[in-house]
Amino acid sequence: IDSRNCIYADKSIFFALTSKTGNGHKYVDELLGQGVKNFVVSQYNEAWNNQDANFWVVENTLSALQFLVGEHRKRFDIPVIGITGSNGKTIVKEWLYALLQPYYRCIRSPKSFNSQIGVPLSVWQMRPEHQLGIFEAGISTILEMQHIAPIISPTIGIFTNLGTAHQEGFE
């Protein structure tokens, strides 16, 4: 996802995400030079034809990332706490982690990774040794939760509060 954080190039898969402010496709050549062999793209460049790499061309790279991580989540039959609300998600997540980690091997969202990109990056970190997941989900537009909820697939839900934060996306 972030070309600056490529540690294991030969074991990495790069999703060339696009947004209003950026286009991940412009980093593909740089990553090829670093040894990355697997890419999910929505814009294929013919110059990549002779590269020793795999390219999966999809309509929407964010949707592909979310789908892949949703399938990854299905591999784990453990309790998962999903936390949402206008405010307080991160502090509630951190409190729960502090209370539960002495008793369970927990995985949690790093920092405030609660967006359509942050949630998949968090859930992707689930491993067989984990006994409990604690993830936060933030929404700022109508129907956004329908993309995030299947990725977290919580067995326990916590709704912190409903306030005016992010309300501009719901008008």
Task: Identify the meaning behind each predicted range.
Residues I1-F67:
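N-terminal leader/targeting and accessory segments in enzymes
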